[in-house]
Every structure is written in structure tokens, then in C-alpha cells.
Amino acid sequence: MLKNILLATVTSVFLLLSVAIHAEPISVVFTCELKDGKTKEDAMAVNAKWLKWARATGGSDEITSSFVSTVIGDMGSFMWVDTYPDITTWGKIADGDSGLDAEFDAVSTCSGNRMYRGEQTVPAK
């Protein structure tokens, strides 16, 4: 009996920890370059369609997407920074097909992407 209670307790703790991990916001960052003759506005027009699709598919208006441009440094590249309320919402997007790949490919070339989970620093007391 004690063994069953201990097993149930340990299982519950792991389940609670996994829920906490899944509830944390994540960001996906794509490093890209605009194609010749294309503008930030061209890229953002395609991305606006994607964001509408992503929010409907993910079931969350908390999904955001930003065009991040260089202020100092290599001016030829930009980043898409997509933020999701949790990994589960991102998974719905990753499993889906927006049908916009060709439109994105027409305006930009992306060389890589990374997924990040940030942890906010609390100021010292």
C-alpha cells in the first residue's frame, strides 16, 4: 500500500512539473535575408497572413510575430521572432501547413532557426 502511495505521489510530482514546463512561453527565431527587390513591407504582408493562420490553428491570440531588423551591424539580415504561450501551442503550428511557404520563399531566404525559453531575472533586494 505504501509503495502505491509513493508511486502515485512521485507520478503526480512529475506530471505537475511537466505541466509547468509546458506552460512557459517560448520564442522561435528565424534568421533571414530579403531577396533582391523585396521590402520589409513585402515580408510583413506575407507574415500577417501567417499570423492570422497561426492564431486560428494554435487557438491563441497570444501568438505574436515580429520583424526584427538590425540597428547596428550587418544591415542585410533580419529575424522573425515568433512567440507562443507554450510548447503545446507551438506544436499545433509546427504540425500544420499554412500553405504560405512559397510566398515566404518569394520574399526572403532564411538560413536557420532556434527555439528559446527565457527566464526572467528578478532584481536583487
Where are these regions (language model features)?
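Bacterial N-terminal signal peptides that target proteins for export
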Residues: 1-10
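Glycine-rich beta-strand-turn "strand-cap" elements at beta-sheet edges
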Residues: 6, 22-27, 61-79, 100-125
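N-terminal signal peptide c-region/cleavage motif recognized by signal peptidases
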Residues: 18-20
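Short N-terminal segments immediately surrounding and downstream of signal-peptide cleavage
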Residues: 23-41
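Solvent-exposed beta-strand motifs enriched in subsets of small alpha/beta binding domains
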Residues: 31-32, 80-82
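Short amphipathic alpha-helical segments
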Residues: 38-64, 98-102
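Short amphipathic alpha-helices within nucleic acid-binding modules
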Residues: 40-42, 85-96
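Mature extracytoplasmic domains of secretory-pathway proteins
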Residues: 52-55, 75-77, 89-92
